[in-house]
Amino acid sequence: MSASAKEVAASLLRSFHTAAEGRSPYRHWFLRDCLPQSTVDEILSLPISAADLGGVSGKRELHNASRHYFDVANRAEHACAESVSSALQDPRVAAEIERIFGVKLGGTYLRIEFAQDVDGFWLEPHTDIGVKAFTFLLYLSTDPTHADLGTDIYDNDKKWVGRSPFASNSAMIFVPSNTSYHGFEPRKINGVRKSLVINYVTNEWRAREQLSYPEQPVTVAEPAFA
């Protein structure tokens, strides 16, 4: 049976409350056990194929036509997409994100990409600053060879300084700024590296079809619950 949005929200909150914080080269957090295991299993089983990169990589937007989101259509079709989206849209969850991670989410919009990266994929260092207010990189795939496929972290000079752990149902969070350089160094990917790229974006986001709730901005509960 699929986990409910309430169960997903409770799992997310537990992972937020136990997140391990790092402050160098910018403030970030590593999380574990983000979603109910049944939800992870359902997402991994979604009937969505990974795209062929055609030898081109470096930026995700180079393959916009073949990207997939927990958008209105996928929310309607897949229970796991609906429960995850609903949990992250929950005003009480938004309030806890604000409290723990020091970000303002009121009036933003939820965008969840189901990323499936194959061999040849890489990302140049970038910050996400601009229309992305919050970044939550939730790793999913269970292949033990993916342990070294975490997000690469860079300093202000775009010099590599570290890498997030990669384990199924773990994550990295940061608040985009002019110092939040991150990317993915070219390296071997066996099979498909699956993750959710979760962002809260401002109203200036143009591709409204990518949003989970394109007509419904995030509201924040007051007071927050623990």
Q: Language-model segments: which ranges?
A:
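Fe(II)/2-oxoglutarate
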Residues: M1-S24, Q210-A226
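Non-heme Fe(II)/2-oxoglutarate
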Residues: V8, F16-I100
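Short linear sequence motifs
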Residues: A9, A19-G22, L62-H63, A167, ...
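A generic alpha-helix propensity feature with a strong bias for hydrophobic helices
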Residues: T39, A50, S168, P217-V220
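Catalytic core of non-heme Fe(II) oxygenases with the double-stranded beta-helix
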Residues: A73-Q89, V93-P214
